[in-house]
């Protein structure tokens, strides 16, 4: 059986060339991209610098011998490759299923180019079936939860081992079960204005192409 995640991870690595500063994504699909970059560094002598989007990816990349720098140690990132939980026809998406949305977005906005790698199931007409992660500071989180309840957003705290999940940046995540997002831009602006919200999982206008894994092979879709 074809591993679609591995397929697109390896394909995305073809866009990486010597001298690049590369954003290394987080999650089960980006894992294979990082794995392939590590192989090329070891076997082909690929010369790149990686900038990671989570502590987990940093550990993985370091174990493969990929040279790493912090986002604050570089002026920009040439290319970031990451997974996504949903992608619509406008190349906007939802990310954060792996709880790394804040670091992922910091790296993405500092990148000259971003590619998302997904399987066919992640391509949707309208965002929202996947719960929208909202990263919030711990102080006042219950008040934010109640605010989202009043708005009808069906919130739930992200849990881990029976406790509220704490992100790499020491925040909580509230997942919003929106079912369907009618106006992505308006919701993003609303969340951006909400005090206590650190970041949200709506990624808008950040990517140039999506590599979609299919049984027939990877399909590269460019933004028009």
From Swiss-Prot:
GO biological process terms held by the UniProt record: pentose-phosphate shunt, non-oxidative branch
EC id: 5.3.1.6
Keywords, sorted A to Z: Isomerase
Keyword Isomerase: yes
Entries under Pfam families matching the protein: Rib_5-P_isom_A
Entries under Gene3D superfamilies matching the protein: 3.30.70.260, 3.40.50.1360
CDD domains xrefs: RPI_A
Biological or metabolic pathway of the protein: Carbohydrate degradation; pentose phosphate pathway; D-ribose 5-phosphate from D-ribulose 5-phosphate (non-oxidative stage): step 1/1
InterPro entries per UniProt: NagB/RpiA_transferase-like, Ribose-5P_isomerase, Ribose5P_isomerase_typA_subgr, Ribose5P_isomerase_type_A
GO molecular function per UniProt: ribose-5-phosphate isomerase activity
Residues bound to substrate: 26-29, 82-85, 95-98, 122
Catalytic activity: aldehydo-D-ribose 5-phosphate = D-ribulose 5-phosphate
Active site: 104
Isomerase keyword on record: yes
Family: Belongs to the ribose 5-phosphate isomerase family.
Function: Catalyzes the reversible conversion of ribose-5-phosphate to ribulose 5-phosphate.
Subunit annotation: Homodimer.
Protein name as annotated: Ribose-5-phosphate isomerase A
Species, as recorded: Streptococcus suis (strain 05ZYH33)
């Amino acid at each position: 059986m074809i591993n679609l995640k591995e397929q697109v991870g390896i394909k995305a690595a073809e866009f990486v060339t010597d001298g690049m500063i590369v954003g290394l994504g987080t999650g089960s699909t980006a894992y294979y991209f990082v794995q392939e970059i590590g192989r090329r560094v070891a076997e082909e002598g690929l010369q790149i610098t990686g900038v990671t989007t989570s502590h987990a990816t940093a550990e993985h990349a370091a174990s493969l011998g990929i040279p790493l720098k912090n986002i604050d140690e570089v002026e920009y990132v040439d290319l970031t490759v990451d997974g996504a939980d949903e992608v619509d026809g406008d190349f906007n998406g939802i990310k954060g299923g792996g709880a790394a949305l804040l670091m992922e977005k910091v790296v993405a906005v500092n990148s000259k180019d971003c590619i998302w790698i997904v399987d066919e199931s992640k391509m949707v007409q309208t965002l929202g079936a996947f719960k929208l992660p909202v990263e919030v500071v711990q102080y006042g989180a219950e008040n934010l939860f109640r605010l989202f309840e009043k708005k009808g957003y069906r919130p739930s705290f992200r849990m881990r081992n029976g406790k509220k999940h704490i992100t790499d940046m020491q925040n909580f995540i509230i997942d919003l079960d929106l079912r369907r997002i009618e106006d992505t831009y308006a919701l993003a602006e609303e969340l951006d204005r909400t005090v206590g919200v650190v970041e949200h999982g709506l990624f808008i206008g950040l990517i140039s192409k999506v590599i979609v894994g299919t049984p027939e092979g990877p399909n590269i879709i460019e933004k028009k």
